[in-house]
């Protein structure tokens, strides 16, 4: 059997289905085929959105009804720090919102979301083969692509004017074209699972046993994306619709090694329970069997995002780090930029310049994002004072730039990638600078035994961030705190130089 399609999308989850839906809706006459290998989607990792990704889901894909009925509204980002595993959870330093967040974000059962987006694509006329496996792929340029597909016991061959790779980390096209690149300077691994019977952080047990801990926070801690912070690692607790909780750990291989244990689920739980808040949340929790996953060397990218007759979207284009939940941001940018460029092409326009510009800007964005936010960040993740500075600056810059851009002129702002213009490049330079300095200060603190000294008895409750210039006040606060840190660091260095032997204590690095 052989058929001809204008567009073949390999991968039917959110990245592939979104791009197919947008193109088919814009050009109803296109023949669009989606090839999905699974009979039903699983609950994959990537369960928390940030504000940019949420804007894409609500204002571009118009999924507000699904998100309101089938998913959980996220109660912000919350971080917990500790010094010793015997500390009380009530003493853990905390960073998070004082009250409910002002812009929507969500905690997602990905299997439900992926199915909802795929159904939207089918309703506008896309064709679906499922379960189906791509057996061979020939990329011969626009109009000369061929895909061999196994559907049940039948082998089908299709020709495609364009092929979109939405296969996630499998990255079929980048690997085939030798464009797949591991990001070796960011060697992070992850383990995650779903648990039942986690402690309700807003429940009566907390209010009765620790009213002084519960009372000051007006927001719901339980529905936040809760982060357990440590030296070289961080863990997440994400509540899902129906009562299950996604629990995960991300760590830098250079700084942390997962302790041994009978199985991955027990190793994950055992380690996170060394954190007092993890111990409180997971003390009675039960790991759901056959729902434990691990992945090494998370960070990677494709050296090219679009070529002659092909494009990569979502995680197939690259992935940096789960911290700050920005995976959906990259899905949004790659899907919408690809949609706009291919929409022009299907309308008969020349896209050579826009394709070249997109390839250049994506690489610039990816590497700027890495160098500005994630490079060597795992050195200071476990120090509350350093992460307070980073929180003000990282989140402030995010709301001034990407969030403000998404909400100011949606949806076309998704094809204008952040950090591409002069202002974005200026912010990128500032962010690279403070990120590198915070990592350097952390290394000095580790060496002299002062790492994490402010990890107890501190609460930083922030008002909600809003897009655009209003978030400059958070940036200014962050810059002031950064400069204070630099002064403190210089004074400590001078004292150490003046009095040899001072600062040679055993390093304090929470494990």
Feature-to-residue mapping (PLM):
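Beta1/beta-strand and adjacent pyrophosphate-binding region of the FAD-binding site
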Residues: 2-15, 33
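Glycine-rich FAD pyrophosphate-binding loop
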Residues: 24-45
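Helix-loop-beta segment of a Rossmann-like dinucleotide-binding subdomain
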Residues: 89-108, 146, 250-254
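Predominantly flavin-linked oxidoreductase catalytic cores and closely associated redox partners
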Residues: 120-278, 335
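FAD/FMN-dependent oxidoreductases across multiple families
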Residues: 231-233, 239-241, 255-374
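C-terminal helical "tail/cap" subdomain of flavin- and related membrane-associated enzymes
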Residues: 341-511
